[in-house]
Amino acid sequence: MIYLSIIFLLLDVLFASIKKKSLVTCVSECWYHIKWAHYVLLSLAALMMLPMLDYTPGNWQFLAFFACAALLFVATAPSYFERFEGRVHSASAILCAACAIAWAVAVVPVALIGCVLLIVAAFDRKHRLIWLELSAFATAYIGVILLK
């Protein structure tokens, strides 16, 4: 299931980038290009990450839960330019990234190798946010794969 989550996330970014004809600046921008498909793909990516709960020791399961739940909120409040929806979206995105990275630090520190994408972010200033987001996703995915 974790591999399906990775595929759904990559399809989301790929479809939006193809439609935009360049790399999107952030995962959330995908909604403005592929609308309902972004909602479906990001929601499926979040739901397929729920096995994180099974592989996580009891003390840290709340981080896995909040990362998945926050990603569902990001998917259901995609219009980040609107006032209320943007606040929900931004708070959920920050919570998702923070919980995913905190989970990796607490449960599988070697998964932080996913943060290697931060090096790309340092050089590609135009697309910095997408690289930061993909780094957080990669860290969580690597952690789950290593725990399996």
What is each model feature region?
Residues M1-T56:
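N-terminal topogenic module of multi-pass integral membrane proteins
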Residues L10-K19, F73-Y80, I119:
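Transmembrane alpha-helical segments that form the membrane-embedded catalytic/substrate-channel core
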Residues L4-F8, L41-L44, L63-A70, C96, ...:
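Hydrophobic alpha-helical transmembrane segments of polytopic
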Residues L42-D54, S92-I101, F137:
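Core segments of transmembrane alpha-helices
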Residues D54-T56, T76-R83, A122-K126, L146-K148:
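Juxtamembrane "helix-exit" motif on the non-cytosolic side of transmembrane helices
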Residues Q61-G114:
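Membrane-proximal helix-loop-helix units in multi-pass membrane proteins
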Residues M1, Y55-W60, I101-L112, K126, ...:
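Transmembrane helix interruption/hinge and helix-loop junction motifs
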Residues V108-K148:
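Terminal transmembrane helical module of multi-pass membrane proteins
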